[in-house]
Amino acid sequence: MATRRELANAIRFLSMDAVQKAKSGHPGAPMGMADIAEVLWRDFLKHNPSNPHWADRDRFILSNGHGSMLIYSLLHLSGYDLSIEDLKQFRQLHSKTPGHPEYGYAPGVETTTGPLGQGITNAVGFAIAEKTLAHQFNRPGHEIVDHHTYVFLGDGCLMEGISHEACSLAGTLGLGKLIAFYDDNNISIDGHVDGWFTDDTQKRFEAYGWHVIPAVDGHNPEQILEAVKQAQAETTKPTLIICKTIIGYGSPNKANSHDCHGAPLGDDEIAAAREFLKWEHAPFEIPAEIYAQWDAKEKGQVAEKAWEEKLAAYAKAYPELAAEFTRRVNAELPANWAAESQAFIEHLQANPANIASRKASQNAIEAYAKLLPEFLGGSADLASSNLTLWSGSKPIRAVENADGNYINYGVREFGMSAIMNGIALHGGFIPYGATFLMFMEYAHNAVRMAALMKQRSLFVYTHDSIGLGEDGPTHQPVEQTSALRLIPNLETWRPCDQVESAVAWKAAVERKEGPSALIFTRQNLAQMDRTAEQLANVARGGYVLRHCCENQNCPDLILIATGSEVELAMKAADVLDAEGVKVRVVSMPSTNVFDKQDAAYRESVLPSHITKRVAIEAGIADFWYKYVGFEGRVVGMNSFGESAPADQLFKLFGFTVENIVEKAKAIL
């Protein structure tokens, strides 16, 4: 029987060999954390390689994602559908083993990591989801949700500011099933960290309210085993296990040096490591005995079967709860969702209200949350401004309301957004979280990661323009809406009234293949009249709100607007119409959605032969030239805002009927 060290060495040599074959990669972390991984995966991790999506599996997150060959080796050795050929294709085009772990490629990879600090933050989201789901569904004698979240992280993750945001909140919420392993090797890309990272990490995490197990020898299986047992025994606090490790362990000449962090070791050094660790096998060769000891398929199938029996007993005792649990973990919307949400939208159209779109957003949350117990809302300490609370909101605390549906994220925009991604990845919830649009800048990379991972995270942004007013340019978004529109696979909405706001929320809820950004105003907006056809076309991202005639060829001019500027466009159209100009007004709440429509529909809204166009939006002007062309004009922002009442700012920056009419006449 192979020893623990030999089992860990299988990880080390698969990692060395794959990085060497790829001619790039990071061998140091997998070699340094191999002993920790061997103990965790073989002695504790509850998982089934034959079903990577088992609802009650433990979650494992590699926050230091550059060490991706660690998780690929673990998945391969444990019996997941990841072959030795897949490992040989490490970092190659269209392989299942990209340079950093990517969700949706190798089965068993729970989240995309690489941007340091986001993995530990996703893990906090996973742990929140587990705890909340357990309190919502578990009943005495029926614990159908009962799993841990394990995360590996390194010095880089702890240096990133987002780790403070996430770990602070994790301690406050008492996430007892979150267990983190800190790869304390004192090395980063630039060398030994003594020159730039001398924090007392133990005291830092104790101050957060974590249970900390310090000074564990990361190459001593017995110490690691005991540390995990202690961590599991502490159920009221998250645990940080500080593992002293040697980066590149087993490399005679490069271990404990940044030389092995982010580059292949080289053939000579790998040969020396083989001799040093007494590994007599060829590259990518693993003895059958080691494969047999690593194989977790049978153990995993037994564990899942036992859980299925628990679920069957639960279904017998609580049939309605069991059906609801199954619906939610399968990410299915309620049977009455489509009809009820559409009825709400039609009710709004029939009952006009000139309200701020942030208030319209709150009304949509109120209506939809009653249909969607899977909603898990929140705000970055701006609930009274973002208007994210509804009558049934139940804020989650460490002990009270552990079965709640709302998270007070505090002033943690980046942390909130990456936590939401973890919640979405875990399953059972649709997370939404809000802040001012200006502060999406703090969270931009987490929004991008949601889009990359195709997760249904709903990012809510209010106070969307110079309409914010007196708080001034530090708080007034200019380029942010366009920046969001440019993120691939993110659908961004900027609705013009309560109806478009409700449609935007509905579209975001129904979109399973990616996130949405919902952008709302501080100021009141006039509701637009619509026919049934126009109402149906709102969901297409752009539609003709004002016709000048039935003939497609008739417009002299097209005005395109979003959000608070749609009313301006309609008023300008009336002025021009009175002067004999035939004007079409297009409301385009989501350029991303509109661009996905078929060519015939897009042509029906924006006929290519009508080149006289003006776009109006209180955001950066440059974005709109793709719609107005060289002959068109844009009424937009080309500078930062100012501190003044909103009406003065709109006049100052040209968002007036008079200026729109003047711009239009200049091209007619």
Swiss-Prot record:
Any one biological process term the GO annotation gives: pentose-phosphate shunt
Keyword Metal-binding: yes
Site location (Important for catalytic activity): 26, 261
Top-level EC class: transferase
Note on how the cofactor is bound: Binds 1 Mg(2+) ion per subunit. Can also utilize other divalent metal cations, such as Ca(2+), Mn(2+) and Co(2+).
UniProt cross-references to Pfam families, sorted A to Z: Transket_pyr (PF02779), Transketolase_C_1 (PF22613), Transketolase_N (PF00456)
EC identifiers of the protein: 2.2.1.1
Protein name per UniProt: Transketolase 1
Source species taxonomy: Bacteria, Pseudomonadati, Pseudomonadota, Gammaproteobacteria, Pasteurellales
